[in-house]
């Protein structure tokens, strides 16, 4: 693995892996991930992907082993707090939050238990895979507690008599409900994030990082945007433009055979709901099309 190539650590398996790979492919990177390979070379860019455990990524960045990493903010902050407590290097630079991997680290208790606030957790034994984040929250609240550290199946700890409550990642809450638990307190909100090691980069690597960031911005913005086309009566054009969400001035073009209407094209950065489309139609708009955008660059 050449030091001249940009080294990016990503999760080998798990909730962030697939979406991370898809993002890089949308950015124009060609690669083939197969079998148990730990290093994958991009076919069209001087980039190497390191496929590792998610909890190894922060340390690889903080120790300067790789240049960039994609990691959930929950895992990143847990490792940062742990290394800081041990006096180990914990510096990194956040380049941007990404548009996937959303979750929250929450304390959950028995579904029948009354909860009035964090003070109700005093003296409880809490099972978690994230002891540093849990400790940070509880210390901030000034609440004494004890920790039961588990590496998986945290939600079964109360039923097994290992703990009174848990602190675990929550997306929908279905797993908690299936185990007779309810969410009581959100400790930390997380999304996937792109991070960079500390230190200088040579001109080629710096330019490649900037290129990736620009393409990521374009991919994420395109995913959140829609291209809207419609025919609008000329006498209702201003009212129709006022209805269109999150839009800059649209492109307005004459129609070849209908002088009473114009074609309106625009990029919307907000969702166009059915109600808005019905209002547009009520104003006389027709041929309303809402299309996804694959890529965009401003």
From Swiss-Prot:
Is this entry keyworded Metal-binding? yes
Activity-regulation annotation: Feedback inhibited by histidine.
Keywords of this entry: Amino-acid biosynthesis, ATP-binding, Cytoplasm, Glycosyltransferase, Histidine biosynthesis, Magnesium, Metal-binding, Nucleotide-binding, Transferase
The record's annotation in InterPro entries points to:
ATP-PRT_HisG_long (IPR020621), ATP_PRibTrfase_cat (IPR013820), ATP_PRibTrfase_CS (IPR018198), ATP_PRibTrfase_HisG (IPR001348), HisG_C (IPR013115), N-reg_PII-like_a/b (IPR011322), N-reg_PII/ATP_PRibTrfase_C (IPR015867)
Output the superkingdom of the source species: Bacteria
Q: In which pathway does it act?
A: Amino-acid biosynthesis; L-histidine biosynthesis; L-histidine from 5-phospho-alpha-D-ribose 1-diphosphate: step 1/9
Cofactor(s) demanded: Mg(2+)
May I have one GO cellular component term? cytoplasm
Q: Name one GO biological process term.
A: L-histidine biosynthetic process
* UniProt subcellular location: Cytoplasm
Q: What does this protein do?
A: Catalyzes the condensation of ATP and 5-phosphoribose 1-diphosphate to form N'-(5'-phosphoribosyl)-ATP (PR-ATP). Has a crucial role in the pathway because the rate of histidine biosynthesis seems to be controlled primarily by regulation of HisG enzymatic activity.
* Family recorded in the similarity comment: Belongs to the ATP phosphoribosyltransferase family. Long subfamily.
Which HAMAP family does this chain map to?
HisG_Long (MF_00079)
Q: What is this protein called?
A: ATP phosphoribosyltransferase
């Amino acid at each position: 693995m050449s030091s001249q190539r940009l080294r990016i650590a990503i999760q080998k398996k798990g909730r962030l892996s697939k979406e991370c790979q898809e993002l890089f492919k949308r950015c124009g990177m060609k690669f083939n991930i197969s079998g148990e390979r730990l290093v994958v070379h991009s076919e069209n860019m001087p980039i190497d992907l390191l496929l590792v455990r998610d909890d190894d990524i922060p340390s690889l960045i903080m120790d300067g082993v790789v240049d960039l990493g994609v990691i959930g903010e929950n895992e990143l902050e847990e490792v940062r707090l742990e290394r800081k407590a041990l006096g180990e290097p914990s510096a990194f630079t956040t380049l941007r939050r990404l548009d996937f991997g959303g979750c929250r680290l929450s304390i959950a208790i028995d579904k029948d238990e009354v909860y009035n606030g964090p003070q109700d957790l005093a003296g409880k034994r809490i099972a978690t895979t994230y002891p540093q984040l849990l400790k940070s929250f509880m210390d901030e609240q000034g609440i004494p507690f004890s920790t039961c550290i588990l590496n998986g199946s945290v939600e079964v700890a109360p039923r097994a008599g290992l703990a009174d409550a848990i602190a675990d990642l929550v997306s929908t809450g279905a797993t908690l409900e299936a185990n007779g638990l309810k969410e009581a307190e959100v400790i930390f909100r997380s999304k996937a994030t792109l991070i960079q090691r500390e230190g200088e980069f040579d001109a080629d690597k710096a330019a490649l990082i900037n290129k990736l960031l620009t393409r990521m911005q374009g991919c994420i913005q395109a995913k959140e945007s829609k291209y809207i086309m419609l025919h609008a009566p000329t006498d209702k054009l201003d009212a129709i433009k006022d209805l269109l969400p999150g839009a800059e001035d649209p492109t307005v073009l004459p129609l070849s055979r209908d002088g009473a209407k114009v074609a309106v094209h625009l990029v919307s950065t907000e969702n166009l709901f059915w109600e808005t489309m019905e209002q547009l139609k009520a104003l006389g708009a027709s041929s309303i099309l809402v299309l996804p955008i694959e890529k965009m660059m401003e």
